[in-house]
Amino acid sequence: MQKFRVYGQSRLNGEVNISGAKNAALPILFAAILAEEPVKLTNVPELKDIDTTLKILQQLGVVTYRDEQGAVHLDASNINHFVAPYELVKTMRASIWALAPLVSRFKQGQVSLPGGCSIGARPVDLHISGLERLGAKIVLEEGYVKAFVDGQLIGKRIVIEKVSVGATLSIMIAATLAKGITVIENAAREPEITDTAVFLNKMGAKISGAGSDIITIEGVERLGGCEHSIVPDRIETGTFLVAAAISGGRIICKNTKASTLDAVIDKLRDAGAKIEVTENTITLDMQGNRPKAVNIRTEPYPGFPTDMQAQFTLLNMVAEGSSKITETIFENRFMHIPELIRMGGKAEIEGNTAFCHGVEYLSGAEVMATDLRASISLVLAGCIATGETIVDRIYHIDRGYEHIEKKLRGLGAKIERFTEKIVD
């Protein structure tokens, strides 16, 4: 089992290059199933979820490889298999995105449900209902979602009941080859959806309105190849900005896009950070000061992102003053708080709200990561705590942060990865 050992009391300063967004790369990789010609993608991060996606695509018959510059090449012209198997899907819920392009182009597709994933309790039902509205017949058998269509998907007006990034992407991807016009209402507006639409349009799709709550897709007969660069990762950017803010440091995030982070930047300014932005950089300077507490309420984009909630929970635990954090997007997303309390943080949880009371310092401890964003907050806590922090289950971090310890060390953090030997 791999773990991180972090030695604390580091002030994080310097420059960091932001990677491509995993949340754009994943749907774009699956959307490449639609292409009848080769596709080249640049700025694709090296992450476990990306590797899993490439393995799923290879299982379907897509030829994939990374060149010496790190670009990912895909050729889906000879897909001969239509099942995304459990042994790959079980580690990544985003695998459901394989279903839409398969049924759209090949009239059939099967994707295993991830372990423990009940359709009624997960947003997977929104993916399925969207495809059904386009004419797909879907059954759940033997742990697989099986979809097929007689003839062709047919464009429809689809109102998504609850704003969902995943469902918006599934419907948009499927509708590119549907007959007629599809209109998605109450669509999610995230930049990763816009990036996926840009990619699809480069291949010959006719999509308008991505980035707004109404997306229109005019179906086309086929999609060709293209080259595309993945949009920068706004959540990684926000994470490094918080890292500097909680440590009193100064950071320049390069290869990023400030316009996708307005809500986060506003809150960091409220916390006392001096921030300057250019077209592709963000500079944050805390000038050695402790942050001020800020209230947070997560909302769909362009509101405050749920994927930054854990990082700001940490910020509030070491800030001056008290704060209220309300999580409106996901349930059970405060699992990092008990671990931060073990490090000396002060907070109470009432339903979907956490009340944080800032302390001057945290103390190193052995803590356990529970999910991607919670785990990075524990690593950052270790960077500023007194003493040594051990973070367990860091495979969560490897799913979403490229070369994280290398980047943190470049900013002055004392962090190392090690493998703990299991004794019988």
Curated annotation (Swiss-Prot):
Subcellular location field: Cytoplasm
Entry superkingdom: Bacteria
Pfam families: EPSP_synthase
Annotated active site: 117 (proton donor)
Catalysed reactions, as listed in the record: phosphoenolpyruvate + UDP-N-acetyl-alpha-D-glucosamine = UDP-N-acetyl-3-O-(1-carboxyvinyl)-alpha-D-glucosamine + phosphate
SUPFAM superfamilies xrefs: EPT/RTPC-like (SSF55205)
EC number(s) from the headed UniProt entry: 2.5.1.7
Pathway note: Cell wall biogenesis; peptidoglycan biosynthesis
Keyword RNA-binding: no
Binding residues annotated for phosphoenolpyruvate, in chain numbering: 22-23
Modified residues (2-(S-cysteinyl)pyruvic acid O-phosphothioketal): 117
Biological role stated in the UniProt entry: Cell wall formation. Adds enolpyruvyl to UDP-N-acetylglucosamine.
The family this protein is said to belong to: Belongs to the EPSP synthase family. MurA subfamily.
HAMAP family: MurA
Family annotation (PANTHER family): UDP-N-ACETYLGLUCOSAMINE 1-CARBOXYVINYLTRANSFERASE
Protein name listed in UniProt: UDP-N-acetylglucosamine 1-carboxyvinyltransferase
Gene: murA
